[in-house]
Amino acid sequence: LSYEAINKLSPEILLRILERIIMVASGSVYPAKRTKVEGILSWLSSENSIRAKTLGGVVIRKRKDYVIFYRELKGCQTSEIVYPLTSRYLTWDNRFYIKLNKSKKLEVRCLGDEGVSIMKSKKILKKQGLSNIPLSAWKSAPSLWSKKRLISVPSLGYCVADDFKIYLKSVRQP
């Protein structure tokens, strides 16, 4: 969300946008309490030294020209582990639908610290993250694992097998 939008849009529109972004990022079916979202909007609209806050399982982080929103790792880590199928999409973390093109015994879980370390060792993620997205945000990204082996991180375009496809789509649209 750009500061330009924050400065141009009416408070009511911004509150609705923030509610929806937080719902999408958290996987919640209900919006956060309006008073809490109003507090976030007030914080975003003011000059202060606080760089990040959380609400409803979402980290809201101020950057130079925009604000980013991403799932808190602790909420993501408690999500039920899903074993994707080839026949239909399964929901993971109330945020993503996942399906495979081949039957494999894989589990979907957040990338976490271990996965981020692997991605850094392969030079896919840098010390600061990737594409202006911090490492802390990548930790909550969906990934596929075979026991302790990282097989795929769809959002990073990483997969150990060329003939293996993962179909990933958002549960909710912003």
Indicate residue ranges for each PLM-predicted region:
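AMP-forming adenylation/ATP pyrophosphatase catalytic core
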Residues: 1-174
